Amino acid sequence: MRRDDPNLPNLCAIAEAVGDLRDRVVFVGGATAGLLITDPAAELVRATQDVDAIVEAQLGEFHRIEEQLAARGFVRDIESGVICRWIHRESRNLFDLMPVDSHVLGFSNRWYGYAVDTARPTSLGDGLTILMVTAPAFIATKLEAFADRGAGDILASHDLEDVLNVVDGREELTKEMETTPARVRDAVRTALKQLLAHADFNNALPGLIADADRTDTVLRRLRRLAS
């Protein structure tokens, strides 16, 4: 873990603030991307505005978890219009808590369940440990989000940027994907094949990654993941 990860301070602040809910929620999203980077020479990931987490809970239980958040100093971010967003009063950090079950809030990501099932304890230092998405689940959830809310816009999608950063900064990802369930592996493969076939992708790739000199490496890894 790199101490200069731009998202680490906010992630630690939220992890501290949720208290024992750390044993229940799984941290996902762009704020965790830097923790998945294993190449010490990799460029820093993008700084995110919020910290995301998911939880396996039915409607009643999810509301009880929301009540616990309120008791821990979180308030709903009404102005944002984001139904799952909270603000931590003390730190002013944004926290998006999303249920795995799409019936609870009316939306989800089909790989959230897999992300919860495969989550691993991850140390943030100073005795602080969270449950965090694995690299394969991160890629699957981000590609799903790219196709959904990003509408496949390769130039404007932070989700795609996060995928490319992890592909670039985690050499072992290809081997990790080989051991994932077939349904996840096939979905990732299909999404990446579509991405690689995009008419503008090859020309846009150098501008989508932190270090344009790594374009050939990233492209080679994407092709292996798509094969």
Roles of regions detected by a PLM:
Residues 1-227:
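Compositionally biased terminal segments of proteins
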